[in-house]
């Protein structure tokens, strides 16, 4: 397929405000491509070259990209930088420069073949893999070879892609729906395969080749989508929901981690499927010493502890581990303990279809607890009073509360069901609980906030529609530094119109691709005619909103937008306010 065909589809996707139109455009695009091309097209649309856990990054900033455009067009870098500053879009700067240039190899002169999708993808992969001495010059040379042959519109999307600002916001579930329609594959089966092996590029190629989905199996080294929990506000409700008895375990305030042990070593993946092994060399060493299996997939929580007292510290302390340099110092200053709570695979045995109580037994069989690796503290209860005693014990130890689970539950990858239920101390009265919401729009600041965003439009996610519904407009809780940071992190996702996956009655000054997740707290969940979350679910014509919302200061970079608080959770929180449990 010619790259120009893909670019036409990208432009149409960018222009639409309707998700159904987006799906139709993708279906048409997939049908025109070969199986090999479909996988590469999917990666490109998602703004990636490989799945997230492989950590393949282009390593190209705006200046390097403009150097490549300069080399291809002859335009001065300073001229291109001025154009970029004027437009605010490196892609538009590249498009204008290419349109104004008289390149000897231009297609218009008939001396060059048009760019092919595979050719562009393969070249970009070479750019990402260029490392060491002379890597930047190599990247510039490779990129300029693409720009030299690209049409202005093609150059726009190549430039946006390489600097990570494609701005399409096509979700994984949208891709899955389009693949299902394009190849006549059952959508639920495709979704299940994706939960097991969440590499959409590989999966797209697989279905395009007509291969059966049952060939996709859980594989050590490839992270699965994590199972997620619902929430309730009292022990009696939780036990009733779980059928009368529950495995209750401490809910540690750390970083959720999926640990893969293979003959090649230990890999640690985040809830967003990113490889975070480099941040936790101490955990890697501890797992090798504590786990007897040759191959295993384990789940646990990495918790920061005080080096002097051993007391558990808040999640924020783990941020020191995210620096790529001087990890050894961070390990010494911010030690951790790994609390394991599940096992999904052991030495060729897929345990995801086995009941939790059996998985617990298998976990205890393969783990020899140490001061660095422990099994999460748990008990089985069928009495609400006993659950509450355990809850208070857990909180007094520095945890967030309990996770209560059905003893007979299987591991439902990627699902947020009622087999796992969070019981946190924050749920003890009205909306003392926080919610994780997605930034979908912003409003220009005034006075001290002039030149930045003064408030943000936030939304909850609905997995049944793959859409985001507004919940509140928040401007409180942000320091000057926060406002500057928010402005900077949101710029790559700025788009000229409301995103097709966002449902909003409010008109924001600026719209964004749903990507950035922040934590918010408020006085209560209230009915609102201004917001679309759960519109009509409680009363006709009104939705749910957070009253007096305030930013807590916590950026949830560990969560994807699809892992944000759901509309169902918002409705549940609203209902629970009517059954307030008075704090003791």
Swiss-Prot record:
One of its GO terms (molecular function) is DNA ligase (ATP) activity. Its cofactor is Mg(2+). Its EC number is 6.5.1.1. Pfam families: DNA_ligase_A_C, DNA_ligase_A_M, DNA_ligase_A_N. ATP binds at residues 249, 256, 271, 301, 341, 416, 422. It catalyses: ATP + (deoxyribonucleotide)n-3'-hydroxyl + 5'-phospho-(deoxyribonucleotide)m = (deoxyribonucleotide)n+m + AMP + diphosphate. GO terms for biological process: cell division; DNA biosynthetic process; DNA recombination; DNA repair; lagging strand elongation. Keywords: ATP-binding, Cell cycle, Cell division, DNA damage, DNA recombination, DNA repair, DNA replication, Ligase, Magnesium, Metal-binding, Nucleotide-binding. NCBIfam families: dnl1. DNA ligase that seals nicks in double-stranded DNA during DNA replication, DNA recombination and DNA repair. PANTHER family: DNA LIGASE 1, DNA LIGASE 1/3 FAMILY MEMBER. This is DNA ligase. It comes from Pyrobaculum aerophilum (strain ATCC 51768 / DSM 7523 / JCM 9630 / CIP 104966 / NBRC 100827 / IM2).
């Amino acid at each position: 397929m010619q790259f120009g065909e893909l670019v036409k589809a990208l432009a149409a996707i960018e222009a639409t405000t309707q998700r159904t139109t987006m799906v139709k455009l993708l279906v048409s695009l997939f049908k025109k491509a070969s199986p090999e091309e479909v996988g590469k097209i999917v990666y490109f649309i998602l703004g990636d070259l490989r799945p997230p856990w492989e950590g393949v990054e282009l390593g190209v900033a705006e200046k390097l990209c403009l150097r490549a455009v300069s080399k291809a067009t002859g335009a001065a870098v300073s001229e291109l930088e001025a154009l970029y500053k004027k437009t605010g879009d490196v892609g538009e700067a590249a498009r204008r420069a290419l349109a104004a240039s008289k390149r000897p190899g231009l297609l218009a002169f008939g001396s060059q073949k048009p760019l092919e999708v595979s050719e562009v993808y393969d070249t970009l992969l070479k750019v990402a893999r260029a490392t060491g001495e002379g890597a930047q010059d190599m990247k510039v040379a490779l990129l300029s070879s693409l720009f030299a042959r690209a049409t202005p519109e093609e150059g726009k999307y190549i430039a946006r892609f390489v600097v990570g600002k494609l701005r399409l916001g096509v979700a994984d579930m949208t891709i899955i729906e389009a693949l299902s329609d394009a190849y006549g594959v059952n959508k639920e089966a495709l979704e299940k395969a994706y939960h097991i092996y969440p590499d959409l590029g590989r999966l797209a190629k697989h279905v395009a080749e007509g291969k059966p989905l049952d060939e996709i199996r859980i594989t050590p080294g490839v992270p699965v989508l994590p199972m997620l929990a619902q929430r309730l506000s009292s022990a009696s409700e939780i036990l009733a929901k779980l059928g009368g008895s529950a495995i209750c375990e401490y809910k540690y305030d750390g970083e959720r981690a999926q640990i893969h042990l293979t003959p090649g070593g230990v890999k640690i993946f985040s809830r967003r499927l990113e490889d975070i092994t480099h941040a936790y060399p101490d955990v890697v060493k501890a797992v090798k010493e504590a786990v007897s299996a040759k191959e295993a997939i384990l789940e646990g929580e990495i918790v920061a502890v005080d080096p002097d007292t051993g007391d558990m510290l808040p999640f924020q302390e783990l941020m020191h581990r995210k620096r790529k340099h001087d990890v050894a110092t961070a390990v010494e200053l911010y030690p951790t303990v790994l609390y394991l709570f599940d096992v999904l695979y052991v030495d060729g045995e897929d345990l995801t279809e086995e009941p939790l109580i059996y998985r617990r037994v298998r976990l205890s069989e393969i783990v020899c607890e140490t001061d660095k690796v422990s099994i999460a503290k748990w008990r089985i209860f069928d009495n609400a009073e006993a659950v509450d005693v355990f809850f208070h014990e857990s909180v007094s130890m520095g945890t967030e509360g309990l996770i209560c689970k059905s003893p007979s539950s299987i591991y439902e990858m990627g699902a947020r069901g009622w087999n796992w239920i969070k019981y946190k101390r924050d749920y003890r009265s009205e909306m003392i609980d926080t919610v994780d919401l997605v930034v979908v729009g912003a409003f220009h600041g005034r006075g001290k906030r002039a030149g930045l965003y003064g408030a943000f439009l936030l939304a909850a996610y609905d997995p049944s529609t793959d859409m985001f519904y507004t919940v509140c407009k928040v401007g409180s809780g942000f320091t000057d530094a926060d406002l500057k940071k928010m402005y900077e992190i949101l710029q790559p996702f700025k788009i000229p119109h409301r995103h097709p996956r966002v449902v909003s009655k409010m008109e924001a000054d600026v719209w964004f691709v749903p990507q950035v997740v922040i934590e918010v707290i408020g006085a209560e969940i209230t009915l609102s005619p201004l917001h679309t979350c759960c519109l009509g679910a409680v009363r006709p014509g009104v939705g749910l909103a957070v009253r007096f919302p305030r930013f807590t200061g916590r950026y949830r970079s560990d969560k994807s937008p699809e892992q944000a608080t759901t509309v169902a959770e918002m409705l549940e929180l609203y209902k629970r306010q009517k059954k307030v449990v008075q704090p003791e």
